[in-house]
Amino acid sequence: MTLLALGINHKTAPVSLRERVSFSPDKLDQALDSLLAQPMVQGGVVLSTCNRTELYLSVEERDDLQEALIRWLCDYHNLNEDDLRNSLYWHQDNDAVSHLMRVASGLDSLVLGEPQILGQVKKAFADSQKGHMKASELERMFQKSFSVAKRVRTETDIGASAVSVAFAACTLARQIFESLSTVTVLLVGAGETIELVARHLREHKVQKMIIANRTRERAQILADEVGAEVIALSDIDERLREADIIISSTASPLPIIGKGMVERALKSRRNQPMLLVDIAVPRDVEPEVGKLANAYLYSVDDLQSIISHNLAQRKAAAVEAETIVAQEASEFMAWLRAQSASETIRDYRSQAEQVRDELTAKALAALEQGGDAQTIMQDLAWKLTNRLIHAPTKSLQQAARDGDNERLNILRDSLGLE
């Protein structure tokens, strides 16, 4: 049995190829069935995200293994093998285990240390268990990877610092306000960055969210997801006073929030402080707002400096994380190698027990028939000894005849002979 990890990711393939190799969720069962129908595949997990498509497999070793799996992947996606081959990576046994642990821990992600990948790996594993997981070694590898990812996040600072604009904006808000459970946040825009911000805020149980956007339909979809209120951009002037935090990211060519608008809001708030995070380019908030007392304005450049500092911290933490992964992968492979001997040990013990039971039964029968106990016990001991050493003796004799000193030494060591 061999463990494999093969696939492509953001480092080896452009999005034009990644999208062709991805597995759609509604056809994943079909893909897994097709994969497990391959004669060499004993168990499989398919991980398919926007940044990677990977197969984690337990397989029987054979000469054409790599060619057969590449052929299956290309046939399934109607790809030319040459298109895929140059972008494909292939990891086996210890390298496969290390790769999965690195992926689950966020060490192989586009954003170093990002936590979302662990959930994606867990979902891929759960999907594979719906009648598809057949290899206990593969299952154990995934379970171990989950615990390693948890250890990495617990013992290092890999996820402690924000390295995305959206996460940095939320981190800044949480640093300034002791708790988000008592604040109102106004989000201006409804694009991808604001979507991420809204989800981060929901996770931190913000008291209230208001989304202002040019088109209500797009904002309403996000609002329904995070439990927010939707308003028009034209309503910002009137509603700004309610917001303790304003995070803005639109594509407007001109500022949406001006100095006068913020002055009026601060006056209505009796000068309670406002945090404004402008992550738009061009800027959504007039720079002069930052000169107002109790208005704390941060631009995307301010966040980038935070991100750069935090990324350096993450890279330092990643060195610690890599050490953990190397150690855990080595220990897992040692466990796996030990398991490969378990079946042999069970068979050997079972064989010895059968000999014992057979000869003991004959000895007891002889005793019941009135035979001499000492003679019967000596006969039992002699037969038991001969039966148990018969196979090892033959192996030793054959090794000697073959002149195989290495095998002789291994057998001597196995039998506990000095």
Curated annotation (Swiss-Prot):
EC number: 1.2.1.70
Marked site: Important for activity: 99
BP-aspect Gene Ontology terms: protoporphyrinogen IX biosynthetic process from glutamate
Catalytic activity: (S)-4-amino-5-oxopentanoate + tRNA(Glu) + NADP(+) = L-glutamyl-tRNA(Glu) + NADPH + H(+)
Keyword Secreted: no
Molecular functions per Gene Ontology: glutamyl-tRNA reductase activity; NADP binding
Pathway where this protein functions: Porphyrin-containing compound metabolism; protoporphyrin-IX biosynthesis; 5-aminolevulinate from L-glutamyl-tRNA(Glu): step 1/2
Assembly information from the UniProt record: Homodimer.
Physiological role: Catalyzes the NADPH-dependent reduction of glutamyl-tRNA(Glu) to glutamate 1-semialdehyde (GSA).
Descriptive protein name: Glutamyl-tRNA reductase
Gene of this entry: hemA
